[in-house]
């Protein structure tokens, strides 16, 4: 980690009561406790900024840059005034890509919500119990928490912790006379969608899946064990017919999103145009406020569920779509939430770089490892890349060149 990095999480020792709750609840053992004095300190090298310690501290002695209590309350208050909605939907980043589909998830649970306040977080476990009651005080009538399944949680214990808090809060609210439907939990994990009619039985997905979730079948298409699938997206990259894709990150949908963005920004004579493929867990602020990123840096952010889902085809296609440079932001090997199969991602990047080198476009692409624990690290690397691309002439590729060796047929 950069020595000049500003830490995203800090313990205020003047407020700390030495209760050690944070020490016992941290899923990454990132909080050290002195056995003699009881003093607790955060080991930033281990910290994943899940926010679970922050939400558990009874005296609010832990300061956190992202999604703090006051910021969350202010957001809900502003959205109440803006939308008039009385329903708050809390959703984990792992089960709700920026493209939406929240309505579909709610409808599948029998909930018909036309107007709601969306609050998207890296983990549901970082919501303080006090915030639930604050949201109700601000005028919220119903709160729906869309949680990942326990085994799917990217922060290990986040789902379990939030479920326990919701259960206790719900029991208390009922004693106070609130409706049973005031708080509701929905379990949902974003996994692959498999269209067997498109499958040709090549079994590439069987070979590439790092979690053993896909099994070859004799004289039949592969079988997916959805309980084992973690939605990393490795299988989607190797499927030649897009028969298997991660819901919310479908190839054609992603292609249309950045192609239309490039067309719109080009029409506004923006230069340089930067496209950022960003792992959901490597950066928080840019993915939460993509409009701000566009206004400040003329950059478009596209989420990917994991480094393994970074498709070389999209990188090449985006350059042909009008972007002057493409930047990929992923977690380091130590921080990766889905470590299995990391070598697959590395091989994909090697292939991508070889193709870009042959096309004389290698300087137009950069891969960075970033962590939200270091405040401002993403912006620093984006600034460096922006200046580099700005020093080059605008990229103008002939449409005919788009038929390159990477492109899926």
What does each model-found stretch correspond to?
Residues 82-125, 266-308, 399:
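Mobile, glycine- and charge-enriched loop segments
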Residues 1-6, 111-117, 147, 216, ...:
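Gly-rich Lys/Arg/Thr-decorated short loops/hinges at beta-loop-alpha junctions or inter-strand turns
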Residues 1-18, 29-49, 67-77, 182-208, ...:
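Ferredoxin-like iron-sulfur electron-transfer modules
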Residues 119-173, 303-378:
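Cofactor-cradling patches in redox/metallo enzymes
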Residues 50-61, 84-86, 229-245, 263-268, ...:
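Short Fe-S-cluster ligation motifs
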Residues 36-38, 62-94, 249-281:
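A short, flexible N-terminal coil/short beta segment enriched in small residues
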Residues 17-28, 45-59, 143, 148-157, ...:
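Local cysteine-cluster metal-coordination motifs and their immediate loop/turn environment
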Residues 175-191, 197, 358-406:
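Peripheral docking tails and interdomain loops at the edges
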């Amino acid at each position: 980690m950069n020595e000049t990095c500003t830490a995203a999480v800090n313990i205020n020792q003047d407020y700390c009561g030495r209760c050690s709750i944070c020490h016992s609840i941290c899923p990454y053992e990132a909080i050290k406790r002195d056995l003699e004095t009881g003093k607790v300190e955060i080991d930033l090298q281990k910290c994943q900024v899940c926010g679970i310690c922050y939400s558990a501290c009874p005296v609010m002695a832990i300061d956190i840059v992202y999604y703090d209590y006051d910021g969350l309350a202010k957001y809900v208050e502003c959205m109440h005034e803006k939308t008039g909605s009385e329903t708050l939907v809390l959703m984990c980043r792992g089960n709700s890509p920026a493209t939406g589909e929240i309505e579909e998830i709610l409808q599948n649970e029998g909930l018909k919500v036309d107007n709601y306040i969306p609050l998207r977080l890296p983990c549901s476990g970082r919501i303080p119990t006090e915030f639930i009651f604050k949201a109700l005080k601000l005028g919220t009538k119903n709160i729906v928490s869309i949680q990942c399944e326990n085994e799917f949680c990217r922060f290990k214990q986040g789902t379990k912790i939030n479920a326990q808090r919701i259960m206790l809060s719900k029991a208390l609210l009922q004693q106070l006379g609130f409706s049973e439907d005031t708080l509701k939990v929905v379990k949902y994990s974003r996994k692959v969608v498999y269209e067997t009619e498109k499958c040709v039985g090549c079994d590439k997905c069987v070979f590439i899946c790092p979690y053993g979730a896909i099994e070859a079948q004799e004289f039949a298409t592969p079988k997916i064990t959805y309980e084992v699938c973690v939605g990393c997206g490795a299988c989607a990259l190797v499927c030649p017919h897009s028969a298997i894709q991660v819901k919310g990150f479908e190839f054609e949908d992603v292609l249309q999103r950045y192609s239309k963005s490039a067309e719109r920004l080009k029409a506004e004579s923006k230069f340089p145009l930067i496209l950022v493929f960003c792992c959901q867990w490597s950066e928080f602020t840019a993915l939460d406020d993509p409009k701000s990123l566009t206004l400040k840096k003329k950059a478009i952010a596209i989420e990917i569920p994991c480094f393994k889902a970074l498709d070389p085809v999209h990188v090449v296609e985006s350059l042909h779509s009008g972007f002057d440079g493409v930047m990929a932001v992923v977690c380091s090997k130590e921080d990766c939430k889905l470590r299995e199969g990391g070598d697959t991602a590395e091989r994909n990047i090697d292939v991508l770089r070889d193709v870009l080198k042959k096309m004389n476009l290698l300087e137009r692409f950069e891969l960075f490892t970033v962590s939200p624990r270091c405040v401002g690290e993403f912006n620093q690397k984006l600034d460096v890349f922006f200046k580099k691309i700005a020093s080059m002439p605008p990229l103008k590729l002939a449409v005919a060149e788009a038929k390159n060796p990477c492109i899926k047929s």
